[in-house]
Design a protein with these regions (language model features):
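Active-site anion/phosphate-binding pocket segments in diverse small-molecule metabolic enzymes
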Residues: 1-165
Length: 165
């Protein structure tokens, strides 16, 4: 006999039907996401009320604030449609993405004079809660009408992989 575990090796159910069956029958597989997408703050910039960021200036500062720039974007597989879905975590706190995710970067609003967020701080975009993520690939898939496979396999070769035993 053989088994093809597929995406369960990554800590996710293969489809909604199986997920519903497992939850309905109170089966605890204790799945945990094994992939976490992490970046860092490359700069913190002050924005005056009325200044805009991103393509099409879709976000405008409602008051004076600071923006942290994160060097990851849709060229890395962190897609534009994640802009309103993912809340990156810095030091355990969620921050909203400002505007649209760009090809090579995205921005988060951190608030004026926020000493909790500094250049080089670790930013957890999605993955395991143990790694500090506030959402996982299933959460993003549910919110964007896709499957976790697409979220995880979409991360491009530009993103360094670090394997942990």
């Amino acid at each position: 006999d053989m088994v093809r575990p597929g995406i369960i090796l990554y800590g996710y159910y293969c489809d909604q039907v199986n997920r519903n069956y497992i939850e309905k029958n109170n089966i605890n597989l204790n799945l945990k996401p094994v992939m976490t997408l992490v970046s860092g703050v490359c700069s913190v910039r002050n924005f005056k009320k009325g200044n805009s960021v991103s393509y099409g200036h879709t976000w405008t500062a409602k008051k004076d604030t600071d923006i942290a720039v994160i060097p990851i974007g849709y060229g890395d597989g962190f897609l534009r449609r994640f802009s309103s879905v993912v809340k990156p975590a810095v030091n355990g706190k969620a921050y909203p993405i400002c505007g649209r995710i760009c090809m090579d970067q995205c921005m988060i609003e951190i608030g004026l004079n926020n000493s909790d967020v500094k250049r080089w701080d670790r930013v957890v975009l999605f993955g395991s809660k143990e790694a500090g993520a506030l959402c996982d690939a299933q959460d993003i898939a549910d919110a964007t009408g896709t499957i976790p496979y697409e979220i995880m396999t979409g991360i491009t070769k530009r993103v360094e992989r670090v394997y942990i035993k």
